[in-house]
Amino acid sequence: MTIAIGKPEEKTSWFDKVDDWVRRDRFVFVGWSGLLLFPTAYLALGGWLTGTTFVTSWYTHGLASSYLEGCNFLTAAVSTPANSLGHSLLLLWGPEAQGDLTRWFQLGGLWTFVALHGAFALIGFMLRQFEIARSVKLRPYNAIAFSAPISVFVSVFLIYPLGQSGWFFAPSFGVAAIFRFILFFQGFHNWTLNPFHMMGVAGVLGAALLCAIHGATVENTLFEDGDGANTFRAFNPTQAEETYSMVTANRFWSQIFGVAFSNKRWLHFFMLFVPVTGLWMSALGVVGLALNLRAYDFVSQEIRAAEDPEFETFYTKNILLNEGIRAWMAAQDQPHEKLVFPEEVLPRGNAL
């Protein structure tokens, strides 16, 4: 009689082998999200560096070109494709470039390349935070918070131009290009008077205020530990005990404002809620602009201002400023439209 001792070998599938490799504990965690994040982030960043350093883009936009043509870090950009190309993906092997790399660069193919790979890289980074949080049994609030800048990127660089006539109306990837796009938004959409923009500003500036107050309050209420009780000398970075006094901080702000956060959970949730909600709201506003929705047009004031030259409000001044921005930008931005503005809508010296 023969007795077999031991367990039969279990056959592992290819999926289990890949899962074991990507989630293995190493210096830089890869994970399933890394299969999306690392290649797309590498290609997006590499495309941007290539575009701003070597590739000329006068063909498509006239806003900026490469360092080789005299631009600096502020003015160089990966420019958007021409308006005539609409929403084409501008694939290198597509009908526009037909496999010609130089032609692809000239047409603005790098912009769609950077925009799409950049969007997937940001999504991959958010999924990475989900994956690591799940593996170490944390809540996923980091990933949820990171969805806010992703929503802004996607709404500005993808959804807005999709709602317009082409990628041409998205921002180019550069510093001066982004500021120019902001002026464009104001001139053509009166963006600063949009309530979603107001909520976004409140979220970003409110978050900065909360961050400054929180940091200062923690520094103010550090427990003394030794003779040199300051931020940098008196504390062991691996100490297990509490570093600052929430009770003292609560008492301080109760005396200042009459109210204060009662516990750390509510305090830190509020610091999460303010900027994330603000960015989400601003992204919603940009989606509205993609559809050319108007917000807060005070038509009665415009009619009265047209009838009475003496009538002037902040709003009517704003309208004149927007007209000036449009007149200044349109000829360069949209030469194919052959726009001609009548005398009465052009900026009028000191009238502004």
Curated annotation (Swiss-Prot):
Transmembrane segments: 40-60, 124-140, 152-165, 207-227, 278-294
Residues with the Phosphothreonine modification: 2
Keyword Nuclease set for record: no
InterPro entries for the chain: D1/D2, Photo_II_D1/D2_sf, Photo_RC_L/M, Photo_RC_L/M_CS, PSII_PsbD/D2
Gene Ontology molecular function terms on file: chlorophyll binding; electron transporter, transferring electrons within the cyclic electron transport pathway of photosynthesis activity; iron ion binding; oxygen evolving activity
Binding sites annotated in the UniProt record for chlorophyll a ChlzD2: 117
PANTHER family: PHOTOSYSTEM II D2 PROTEIN, PHOTOSYSTEM II PROTEIN D1
More about this protein: 2 of the reaction center chlorophylls (ChlD1 and ChlD2) are entirely coordinated by water.
Full protein name: Photosystem II D2 protein
Native source species: Pleurastrum terricola (Filamentous green alga)
